[in-house]
């Protein structure tokens, strides 16, 4: 069956001398693998639509075995991302997480839209950390191991959330903090912001401003949390660990400042 599918290339792999095997995150059938015949040939029409992070409209033959791309049309090349080492590193991280955590052909239009909107944001804005954090939290929820952020993970209390416990799987209130002496201190305001990031559509967020140390704290929490519950080694994270990102001061638009 020939299907018209809009999607984003999240992984590519050489297949034989002239072909590519690509992984596409789509708005119609979720994540799937497809063979792009001749895509490694320099003059192939397939070469342009099988580059990493390309958003394209694919005409794909979906069969019982490996799907095959018949043709494609580039919708958005995200050129700025692909020409910027920092933005490329972040999107590579997002793409690898998505590939590792999503089951094949399990459609989720909302998550796909968040992935696409995050790429648009990164392509057009200087701020890259926070949109990725927002997507990451939603992806954890889809994968079934989201942290408890709206209430205490021990007693359900929604007030006085002051510690994040990797061991307990989320926030702890002041009364339950003793359950994990190694829990990470986090302000109540920042904990509320983290919960907001996990729930809200990126399109509803204006420009975002956060102190660099708070961004780094959230990143530390999510890294340690993923290491405990994620189950897959993420190769691209090593590149992020080696990069010191500039967090700009955003002066215009809606902002969250903590």
Curated annotation (Swiss-Prot):
Name the family the entry cites. Answer: Belongs to the RecO family.
Keyword Hydrolase (UniProt) = no
Q: What does this protein do?
A: Involved in DNA repair and RecF pathway recombination.
Task: Keywords in alphabetical order, please.
Answer: DNA damage, DNA recombination, DNA repair
Q: Does the keyword DNA damage apply?
A: yes
Q: Which InterPro entries match?
A: ARFGAP/RecO, DNA_rep/recomb_RecO_N, NA-bd_OB-fold, RecO, RecO_C
Instruction: From the Swiss-Prot or TrEMBL record, give the protein name.
Output: DNA repair protein RecO
Q: Which PANTHER family match?
A: DNA REPAIR PROTEIN RECO
One GO biological process term: double-strand break repair
Q: Which GO terms describe its cellular component?
A: bacterial nucleoid
